[in-house]
Amino acid sequence: MNKPVLVSFLVSGDPNPDATLKFMKTLDKYSGVIELGIPFSDPVADGPTIQAADVRALSNGFKIAKSFEVLKEFRKESDTPVILMTYYNPVFKRGIENFVISAKEAGAKGLIIVDLPLQEATEYREICKKHEMGTVFLAAPNTPEERLKISDEASTEFLYLISTFGITGARDTFEQMTFDFIKRARTTCKGKICVGFGISKGSHAESLIEQGADGVIVGSAFVDIIKNYGDSEEALVKLEEFAKELSEGIDKGYEKRNK
């Protein structure tokens, strides 16, 4: 991840596993990383869009093993890094080590466990290190300096900067607070920093990259397309068009940053 990248988020199994695989292949063209969300019945950090996608996947009989199968299939054609996003409950129920091994065997590059605080993640981090599984932790605009440093050190792939307070979901604009947070993280952190929550336009990606982000994480806006177009050729066209717009925004932001 040298040049800034698009991190594209999809909910695994929405609306079905075969569609997820097609969506991943479509987004792969413009994505430096793909984040694959494992549906969960109580996704507290996610807004209505991703919650609804989780419900769609779960109501169609989704099982965690399906995420691993989809990833294995994707791996046959692409070496783009895939980060699995989940909540702690499914990992705990399966057993942390079993989950990490399954994810590794499927071809995952790293894991995000949204609701696992860093101070409670010692065992998880040790297991990930043992199996060479990457870790991604989150930081918010009010994260103190020292915790930001520790979170950065604990994140082997990138640190996930939450652009604003609250839940995921598309927004129209970003506040100065977000840009200040990126600059602060850029100064404090040694590793990569990617910004997520609320990115829904190429211009958003442009401004966030210009401020110093190494990547933008886009989820709800992609999931909205899937909600509207389902498992269809039109969905693939719309996903690709939007990914292209975001990618172009990233490139523009990077050019501005380097002027």
Swiss-Prot record:
**What pathway does this protein act in?**
Amino-acid biosynthesis; L-tryptophan biosynthesis; L-tryptophan from chorismate: step 5/5
Catalytic residues, per the record, are: E35, D46
Output the Gene Ontology cellular-component terms: cytosol
Give the species: Methanococcus maripaludis (strain C5 / ATCC BAA-1333)
Q: What class of enzyme is it?
A: lyase
HAMAP family linked: Trp_synth_alpha (MF_00131)
This protein's record includes keyword Iron: no
- Report the function annotation for this chain: The alpha subunit is responsible for the aldol cleavage of indoleglycerol phosphate to indole and glyceraldehyde 3-phosphate.
Which UniProt key words apply to this protein? Answer: Amino-acid biosynthesis, Aromatic amino acid biosynthesis, Lyase, Tryptophan biosynthesis
Kindly indicate where the leader peptide sits in this chain.
Answer: none
Q: What are its E.C. numbers? A: 4.2.1.20
* Catalysed reactions, as listed in the record: (1S,2R)-1-C-(indol-3-yl)glycerol 3-phosphate + L-serine = D-glyceraldehyde 3-phosphate + L-tryptophan + H2O
Concerning SUPFAM superfamilies, the annotation shows: Ribulose-phoshate binding barrel
The similarity annotation says: Belongs to the TrpA family.
On subunit structure and binding partners, the annotation says: Tetramer of two alpha and two beta chains.
Q: Which domain of life is it from?
A: Archaea
Write the protein's name: Tryptophan synthase alpha chain
Q: Which GO terms describe its molecular function?
A: tryptophan synthase activity
Question: Record's Gene3D superfamilies?
Answer: Aldolase class I
Q: Which InterPro entries match?
A: Aldolase_TIM, RibuloseP-bd_barrel, Trp_synthase_alpha_AS, Trp_synthase_suA
| Amino-acid biosynthesis listed as a keyword | yes
